[in-house]
Amino acid sequence: MSAIDDLPPLREVIRQHALSARKSLGQNFLLDLNLTARIARAAAPLDNSTIVEIGPGPGGLTRALLALGARRVVAIEHDERAIPALQDISARYPGRLEIVHGDAMTFDPRPLLNGESAKIVANLPYNIATQLLINWLTTEPWPPWYDMMVLMFQREVGERIVAREDEEAYGRLGVLANWRCETKILFDIAPSAFVPPPKVTSSVVRLVPRAEPLPCDRKMLEQVAAAAFGQRRKMLRQSLKSLGVDPARLAQAAGVDATRRAETIPISGFVAMARELADIRSEG
């Protein structure tokens, strides 16, 4: 019996269902139910919440979410070997766990939500974690279909998500994430907590969507950030040339010094340049 419910410990679940982690699926199983409960509590309040979980594996986080009061969990699992273990959890929490055997990169959970808002809570497979986050950050319309994300990443990715100007990890991901969300690293988890242990420390990050991000066209913002950080050590007057407009004109119209580098520009500066880029291109 585990610490949070009357289901078997996760090591026993893995043994029963022969769930060896597959590197090809980016799997690292978190077996400490105290840690999975800590992740679940980070998404509080859970009462009456619908949770979308990606890559539940043997179900440690799934169990924590349900035990701590989530009304409904939609668990999207690509690995068919994990489905029987999740079905055992569903039997323990009847009517509260919906198991989807599918690929989170292509599966859209919104039709299952019946118009209700949800929270995304997941120990994401490392090999698709960043792209999944970008998919969620670029969803339209905004505000999005979720009202919170509590996600685990490699520490280096977590630092990029929360980074702001003049920080070493600041880049395209930080611009997009902090433009649309309030972000925070909540805590780290050591490699020893996982089976198999990854080579790096993991971080749990919370992202809360902003109801009204600074107004600009998202695609223009992504283009400006991609150009600027594509040559991050060069001044904007050089790095922005790839946009096909006069970089000096663009920066000046946005109130940004074209002799500065991308890593020193706040999100408001990127937003201003994105708006000016849209105006310049609309002029033909």
UniProtKB/Swiss-Prot annotation:
HAMAP family noted in UniProt: 16SrRNA_methyltr_A
Group of enzyme by EC: transferase
EC number of the protein: 2.1.1.182
GO cellular component terms, A-Z: cytosol
GO term, biological process aspect, one: rRNA methylation
Phylogenetic placement of the source organism: Bacteria, Pseudomonadati, Pseudomonadota, Alphaproteobacteria, Hyphomicrobiales
Keyword RNA-binding: yes
SS bonds (residue pairs): none
Protein keywords: Cytoplasm, Methyltransferase, RNA-binding, rRNA processing, S-adenosyl-L-methionine, Transferase
Family assignment from sequence similarity: Belongs to the class I-like SAM-binding methyltransferase superfamily. rRNA adenine N(6)-methyltransferase family. RsmA subfamily.
Catalytic activity: adenosine(1518)/adenosine(1519) in 16S rRNA + 4 S-adenosyl-L-methionine = N(6)-dimethyladenosine(1518)/N(6)-dimethyladenosine(1519) in 16S rRNA + 4 S-adenosyl-L-homocysteine + 4 H(+)
SMART domains attached to this UniProt entry: rADc
NCBIfam families: ksgA
A GO term, aspect molecular function: RNA binding
Protein name, UniProt field: Ribosomal RNA small subunit methyltransferase A
Protein location: Cytoplasm
Positions with a binding annotation for S-adenosyl-L-methionine: 28, 30, 55, 77, 103, 123
InterPro entries reported in the protein's UniProt record: KsgA/Erm, rRNA_Ade_diMease-like_C, rRNA_Ade_Mease_Trfase_CS, rRNA_Ade_methylase_Trfase_N, rRNA_adenine_dimethylase, SAM-dependent_MTases_sf
Location (main, coarse): cytoplasm
Function summary: Specifically dimethylates two adjacent adenosines (A1518 and A1519) in the loop of a conserved hairpin near the 3'-end of 16S rRNA in the 30S particle. May play a critical role in biogenesis of 30S subunits.
Superkingdom of the source species: Bacteria
Pfam families from the UniProt entry: RrnaAD
